Every structure is written in structure tokens, then in C-alpha cells.
Amino acid sequence: MPNMRHRVNSLTEEHEENMQMSKLTGHLSSISTLFPVKNDASQTLTLGQLGLGCPCQLVSLWHYLRKNSPSRAVNIKIFESQFDALADFNLKLASLTSPDPRLPRDDEQSTMVEALLRADIVAIEGCQRLIFDDGRVILDIYLGDTLSQLKCILPTSVKGDMTDNSALIAHWNITEKVKAGSLDQAMLWQIAKLSRDNAALSFTDPESKETRQMMALARSVGLRTLETTVSETTVPETQQQTENKNLDTASDAIPLQERRALRHAQSDKFQYCPVSAANEGDEDCDGEIAIIGGGVASTHLALSLAQRNKKVRIFCSDANFAQQASGNKQGAVYPLLTPDNGHLSHYFQQGYLFTRRRLQALVDDKFAVSYDFCGVLQTGFDDRSSARLDKIINGQSWNEKMAYPIDAASATQIAGIDIDKAGIYYPLGGWICPHEFTRAAFDKAARLSDVSVEFNADITRIEQREGLWYLYKSVNVQHSCTDSHTPDDSEELEIGPFANLVLANGQGLTQFKQSEKLPATGFRGQVSHIPSRNALTKLSTVLCSHGYLTPGNNNFHCTGASYVKNPTNLDYCATEQVENLHKIRHSYVDKPWTEDVDITGHSARVGVRMVTRDHAPMMGCAPDTDSMLAQYEQHQHTKESIKFWKETPAPTHKGLFILGGLGSRGLTSGPLAAEALAAQLCGEVIPLSMPMLEMLNPNRFWMRKLIKGKAL
């Protein structure tokens, strides 16, 4: 006799699967109505979702978008308040790698599942950006209290006008696990704030009393509601509520005005931190964005812009990429954590994960980048530094993929050589070859869009005329006269115009009149190249202490680096070479393997990293410091001045942007800053919280004081 219980359970599971797929099909049908008849590939379609939901739904949506709108960029923003939901999501995602043998194999969807698994979403608070299909599908995962996450997102506009909401979320999917108690009116107002005026919410369980309550609340804030109904024969039908088919302008006008007022109120409170999109320019500019620089910052910005089909022109002062601070053979990648896990710490964690994913995408595309995510082991080198590390690791319940404490024995086991010190281990960390990472980013960008570079372009000054930017470089003029003793002259060559210009030129960031007051300081760093020999060959992780030491690559290790403020030259320095050796021996006292660190070959590389006082990069609109200081003369530090600085738009050089001050961890912080600036330039919702945008804004060193009524 057949096992009837097993048969009933099987039929029940099959019925539930059919119901889920039918609901999904209805959801996809509602999304399809958002695509215009004539596909506009220049505008990103932004979708929102509450709850991680089922991974098969996400994969199916991705597959649907790839099939039905392959040239249209789509940004999906998913908000999940429960960290435990991520573990369940990952388990279900992993199960999709073993497809049901009863169903036909879909290699394309299998590839998508593998890509999501390799993205390795980590359960940390804030936004993690995942980029697929060369930027056509962007997935933003917001973890943590959903209301708090929504409140910290700045609504943006392509044209800088809050009435233009085309860049905001067009459609929301409310997953089944979202309950009425959590989707209250406060959250719905925040959803409405981030949504287009005609945005809709779809619910997959519209018949329940709880869902009906949520739908009524949604309509009270002016959001349309869609429902997916499923018949017993599992034929899907997406229908809009009858009362929503023809919007009652009288009843909807008030909530629509209130939503716009919310956006304006949030924008008004952020006047001191300008977040402007790129200028539209005119026909002479051809939409081309100019970037000065040739390192990690400039090329990764070019790649992020190329993924948005932008035309980019890079001006590099050297004969090739990565001849400055980005030219080292190996650079450590690990987050900067703080005991309070504040905004700086959150930014570096998100940047750390973004860099890993950006690198993986380039490697998957067969670009040659040397790297090894072998982990990073950080230990103290004296009582003070050891106490600092203890304070960091014990100050928070860090996710174990991010960092965890290890004892002395474990440190030795992980490193492969005798460490015998407790410390912090960053399991996803490691090292990347910066100059190869830089070159790969440019090559990928040039493959995707009209991205070009001009080498040996030493830009000596920049100038704005009639809202457009012009660049000037010196060129030698050879004389044709017979007198060979007549010296060649130098004259200025004008390049431009450009509607938008980005300064991403590392140590040259402050060389122009418009940027000379930016408080970023150059620090010389000499990195020593050590032959791999004896015990050093066993080193299996990056060591960070007073100095750092990488595992071998091409029979060499990197160690260093020196830290000399405002250097006068970039020549090799024997003293700094010895200092690098002493740092290693100071960090690991009396360890025999330190005797294998050989600096006698005098092999090293010198670069200058630009460092800010607060260790955060600079990203955003270039402040007009002359105008700011002139206003300061009129509004000295009083209670009235606080109101002025908070409510008055901070002066900027329109069309000029800053990307620099990456410091010693540019590999960790740079690519995400570049991606965020690209989103800002294109008028998209930036994948950083408002406090982070404030932290990165180049004007922060003045505004932090001014909005508190303090003297500069």
C-alpha cells in the first residue's frame, strides 16, 4: 500500500510551490507595466522590497529583467530588519544550486544563483551594494531596523528639483513575512518619501485581514496598492484595486503634497551638505565627464560611470596608470573598525565588501589582477596598541565574517609562522595588486562605454567660464629656426569645455586654486620589497602591526610603510628601508623568522598618500571655500549664525567634484566612494546613509564647526 501521508505532504508542498510561482508571475506582470514602450536605457528603474523574501523570487525577477529589458538598468532595494532572515535566505539560496530533477535545467538561472552566493552578503547594519550584469542589475541590501534605514536615505533628483522624482522608487513588493505591526504609518510615510508620485505597492496575500489593513494605510499616504490574486488553477492575474484605477485627485492631492514636503524638509535640513547631480551642460560638452587622475579613485569612478553608459575622459599626468600611490605591488584590504562602530567604521565595512565584489567581477571577466583573500591578522606592538585592539574587538558583537578575536596559538596557526600574540583576524581580508586593479577597472570601463585616457597630461590649472570647465596643460613649442641654441618655449593648451569635472588626482588634489584649501595632507610612504626565503615562504596571511607584511607574490613580500609628512622628494631612502625592518622586528620581538626579512637589495617603491584628519575619504561637491569664508566674515559664531549655516545652501563650485583623501586604505575605501559619486552624478539614490554623506563631504571640516556656532 502506498505511503499516503508522504503522498499528501508531497502534494501540499507542490501546491504551495505553485501558489508561490503564481504570485511571483503576477508580481512580475505588475512590474512589466513600469517599462515604457520605448525603452529608455539612460534612466535607471528603481524597485523596492520589504523583507528579503524567497531567493527564487529574486532570481526569477533578475531572469525576467534580463530577458524582457536587457538594456535597462534596474536597481532593487531590499530592506530586511531581521538579521536572522539573511541566514535563512542564504540556506534557501544554496539549495537552489541543486535544482529539482523534475524541472528542465536552466543554466542562466543557475549562474545567477552562483553569483548571488559568491557575493556573500554579510549580516551587518546598513547598505551592501551588489552589481551584476555590468551594472544593469544593482541589488542594494539594507539590513537593520527598516524605519531607521529609510529615514537615513536621501531622496535625490536627476535635475536637482524635488518635484522631479523619476530617480525614486517606482514599485514596492511587500513580502509575506511583513506584518501590519511593523508596516505602520510612520514607515509608510518614509516609503512614500522615497517613492515616485505614482508608485504602487504590491501584496502577495491580499485576502488576509492584516494585509487589508496595510493596504488601507498605504492608500492613506497616497500610495497606490496592487494585489496579486491566484485562482485554484494557479492562473495569475495582477489587478489594481478598483478604487485606485482612477486616482481621486481631490483625495490624493493632500498626501502627495505631504510626501513632497517630507522630501523638501529632509533636503532643507541637509543644506550644509550639498549633494548635487552632474550639470546637464550643452551640445558643446557632449555629456562627457572629465576626470583628472590615474589611480584607483579615477579608474573606478570611470568604471562606475561606464556601467551607467556615461562618456568619460581621464587626464593622467604620468605615462601610465598607477604611477603614484596606487602603484604598489601589494596592498592590504581590511576594514577600519572603531570601538563605537560609528559611521566611519560602518563605511569601511561596506567599502571592504564592495571592493571584494568589484575585484571578483573583474577577475570573473578574465582581467589579470593578482590578489589573495588570505585573511588579515592584526596584533599590537606595545601595551597601548594592544589595549586599543582589545577595546575594538570587545566593544561590539562583530559579525564573524567581519572580524573576530584570536588567541596566541590560533594566531600562529593562521599565519603559518610563529606569532604567539593574541589579536584580531579579518577572515575576508587579504591583499590586492593596486596597479593591476587600477588598470583592470579602466579596461573594463573602456569595454562598456566611451571611456578614454590622455597620458602625460599634466593639468596645471582649471577654470570655469559660463558654467563650463576648461583644463589647461603646458606643452613645449619647438622653434623651426636654424639657430639650434634657441630654447624651446612653453605655452598653455586649453582642453574643454566640460560640464562636469572630477578631481581624483591623489597627491595633486590641492594643486588647483579651487581645491587648494582642502585639508588633505600628503604623507610619503616607502614600501620595501623583501625576497621570499626560508620561514617567510610559509607566511599564509597578511600581518598588520607596527608595520605590515604580506605573503609572497612572485617571490617577494611587501613590508612597510614609512610615514613622512609633506615630503620634499620621492627618492629611495635607505633610512626608511631600515625603519621598515625595525617595525617588523619591533612588532614580533625575538621571532627567528624576522631574521629572514632582508632589506639589503634596496628594493622599494615610494608614493604619497593624501590623508584627512578624520581618516575618511573626500567625496562629493567641491566646496567654494572663498565664498564660504566671505560668508563667515559676515556671520560670525553666534546662535543666529548656526541657523544661517544650517538653512543656507553651502557654496560649491558647480560642476566640480572631489574624490580623494583615501589615505593608507584606499583599496578598501576608494571603490565604494567612486560608486557613490557616480550615483550622485547620475541623480540616483546614493547607497550611503545621510550621516555617511555628511562624513565624506569635502566641506565637512568647516561645516562641522559652523553649524555648531564655533569659530573656524
Swiss-Prot record:
GO biological process: methylation; tRNA wobble uridine modification
Cofactors demanded by this protein: FAD
Disulfide-bonded cysteines: none
Subcellular location: Cytoplasm
Keyword Zinc-finger belongs to the record: no
Residue ranges of the region described as FAD-dependent cmnm(5)s(2)U34 oxidoreductase: 292-712
Pfam families given in the database record: DAO
Gene Ontology annotations for the cellular component aspect, listed alphabetically: cytoplasm
Molecular function GO labels: flavin adenine dinucleotide binding; oxidoreductase activity, acting on the CH-NH group of donors; tRNA (5-methylaminomethyl-2-thiouridylate)(34)-methyltransferase activity
Superkingdom assignment: Bacteria
Reaction catalysed by this enzyme: 5-aminomethyl-2-thiouridine(34) in tRNA + S-adenosyl-L-methionine = 5-methylaminomethyl-2-thiouridine(34) in tRNA + S-adenosyl-L-homocysteine + H(+)
Keywords assigned by UniProt, alphabetized: Cytoplasm, FAD, Flavoprotein, Methyltransferase, Multifunctional enzyme, Oxidoreductase, S-adenosyl-L-methionine, Transferase, tRNA processing
SUPFAM superfamilies per the UniProt record, alphabetical: FAD/NAD(P)-binding domain
Coiled coil: none
Region spans: tRNA (mnm(5)s(2)U34)-methyltransferase: 1-268
The protein's Enzyme Commission number: 2.1.1.61, 1.5.-.-
Main function: Catalyzes the last two steps in the biosynthesis of 5-methylaminomethyl-2-thiouridine (mnm(5)s(2)U) at the wobble position (U34) in tRNA. Catalyzes the FAD-dependent demodification of cmnm(5)s(2)U34 to nm(5)s(2)U34, followed by the transfer of a methyl group from S-adenosyl-L-methionine to nm(5)s(2)U34, to form mnm(5)s(2)U34.
Membership in a protein family: In the N-terminal section; belongs to the methyltransferase superfamily. tRNA (mnm(5)s(2)U34)-methyltransferase family. In the C-terminal section; belongs to the DAO family.
Listed HAMAP family: MnmC
NCBIfam families assigned to the protein according to its UniProt record, in alphabetical order: MnmC_Cterm
Protein name, entry field: tRNA 5-methylaminomethyl-2-thiouridine biosynthesis bifunctional protein MnmC
Organism: Shewanella sediminis (strain HAW-EB3)
